Amino acid sequence: MDMKNMREYMSWLYYQYLLITGIYVLEPWEQSIFNTVLFTMVAMVIYTSYVFVPIHVRLALEFFCELVGGQPESTVALMT
């Protein structure tokens, strides 16, 4: 894909973003505030997922392992 097609594609994606969110009717300063708030919220969701999802997955795995009769990690560590 050459640079002209890539630029046109990115321009088309940005146009779709403007239409889907409805911010094409806003003034430029309102668009920048909206984009800042949206970017901040997306960044917070990504950061929170990065920090807390692994913890919850580990706890869920421990819970389900105990349900099916597996030994907890502390018991296995003591036996060796």
UniProtKB/Swiss-Prot annotation:
It is found in: Endoplasmic reticulum membrane. The lineage of its organism: Eukaryota, Metazoa, Chordata, Craniata, Vertebrata. It holds the Pfam family SPT_ssu-like. The chain crosses the membrane at residues 12-29, 37-57. Residues 1-11, 58-80 are cytoplasmic. InterPro entries: Ser_palmitoyltrfase_ssu-like. Pathway: Lipid metabolism; sphingolipid metabolism. The keyword Glycoprotein does not apply. It comes from the Eukaryota. Belongs to the SPTSS family. SPTSSB subfamily. Component of the serine palmitoyltransferase multisubunit enzyme (SPT) that catalyzes the initial and rate-limiting step in sphingolipid biosynthesis by condensing L-serine and activated acyl-CoA (most commonly palmitoyl-CoA) to form long-chain bases. The SPT complex is composed of SPTLC1, SPTLC2 or SPTLC3 and SPTSSA or SPTSSB. Within this complex, the heterodimer consisting of SPTLC1 and SPTLC2/SPTLC3 forms the catalytic core. Within the SPT complex, SPTSSB stimulates the catalytic activity and plays a role in substrate specificity. Keywords: Endoplasmic reticulum, Lipid metabolism, Membrane, Sphingolipid metabolism, Transmembrane, Transmembrane helix. GO terms for biological process: ceramide biosynthetic process; endoplasmic reticulum organization; sphingolipid biosynthetic process. Component of the serine palmitoyltransferase (SPT) complex, which is composed of SPTLC1, SPTLC2 or SPTLC3 and SPTSSA or SPTSSB. The heterodimer consisting of SPTLC1 and SPTLC2/SPTLC3 forms the catalytic core of the enzyme, while SPTSSA or SPTSSB subunits determine substrate specificity. SPT also interacts with ORMDL proteins, especially ORMDL3, which negatively regulate SPT activity in the presence of ceramides. This is Serine palmitoyltransferase small subunit B. It is a multi-pass membrane protein. One of its GO terms (cellular component) is serine palmitoyltransferase complex. Residues 30-36 are lumenal.
